[in-house]
């Protein structure tokens, strides 16, 4: 595939995923999880798409998204992408969109404190703001890791519980 088609592939991924994506997510989707582009080419073409205003950086976020010009460009030239790749991208987006949305919306990290305890930071973000940030100090690393691993699956449930409890 030539560089123009590879750039169209990236635009097609944005359109089909229908959510803003981090650069790391685009690189994973296009080159690690699928073999649509090489990592280095994907990184270069993504940067070029931003430079030419076909993709933009979402304000107050690490995410990127397709611009209206990018949508127009894709509408004119998407047929240049081989239909087999378009079908793969469409199926991949349908099957994985929510997984990536959760991964980007629900942030969690932990760090060791001077006294040997751990602070776990859990966040729920939307496209441009943090909806909730929760910090908890736990006794040891295993508890911090457990919370870290549980956060993506339990974030919305935790938010709803806190919201309902505080507003009762």
Protein language model regions, located:
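Accessory beta->alpha helical hairpin/"wing" motif in late/C-terminal subdomains of nucleic-acid enzymes
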Residues: 59-77
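Glycine-rich, Lys/Arg-enriched anion-binding loops that position phosphate/diphosphate groups
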Residues: 71-90
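Short amphipathic alpha-helical interaction segments
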Residues: 36-51
